């Protein structure tokens, strides 16, 4: 009988976030059902569609939250004063193109994620609300978040380049669930 380190073994009902946390510390995660290890999970398994959809769902939820908080903080598109003229022009052009195609949308829906994040996270209270301690941390997180988002969207490797971001997202998700 093979012995496993206790912190490598999770119960069958554990969350995907629990699996990610184990794989942050170990090469393998073992799943136990009825007292027996029945499954081995490795980091490479995190490339599979189910995990990628889970992560993309979290990415999408985060983007929606940032847009919602931006719209609440700056009603009537007053957030546009926070953007450069060039970036705002690109957002307007995208909105106009979407409308031409019959897709009704708000201007904020056409602003790039990094721009929305930068607008919102320039506000010290928002930085703290999202659990960051400095603007430098925010900028790094935005860059890593975008990398993960882009790699997910374009079916690129996420384990090699985005593992730290995946682990942080899993921890954050667990804290949200625990708080609820």
Task: Specify the residue positions occupied by each region the protein language model found.
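Bateman (tandem CBS) regulatory domains
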Residues: 1-8, 42-45
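Amphipathic alpha-helical interface elements
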Residues: 13-28, 36-180
């Amino acid at each position: 009988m093979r012995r496993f380190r206790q912190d490598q073994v999770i119960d069958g009902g554990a969350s995907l976030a629990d699996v990610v946390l184990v794989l942050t510390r170990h090469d393998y995660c073992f799943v136990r059902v009825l007292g027996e290890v029945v499954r081995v999970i490795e980091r490479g398994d995190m490339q599979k569609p189910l995990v990628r959809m889970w992560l993309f769902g979290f990415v999408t939820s985060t983007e929606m939250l940032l847009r919602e908080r931006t719209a609440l903080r700056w009603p009537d598109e007053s957030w546009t004063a926070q953007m450069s003229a060039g970036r705002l022009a690109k957002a307007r052009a995208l909105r106009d193109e979407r409308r031409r195609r019959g897709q009704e949308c708000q201007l904020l829906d056409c602003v790039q994620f990094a721009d929305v994040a930068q607008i919102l996270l320039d506000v010290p209270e928002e930085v703290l609300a999202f659990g960051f301690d400095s603007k430098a941390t925010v900028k790094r997180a935005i860059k890593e978040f975008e990398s993960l988002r882009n790699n997910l969207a374009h079916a690129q490797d996420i384990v090699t380049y985005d593992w730290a971001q995946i682990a942080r997202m899993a921890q954050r998700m667990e804290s949200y669930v625990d708080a609820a």
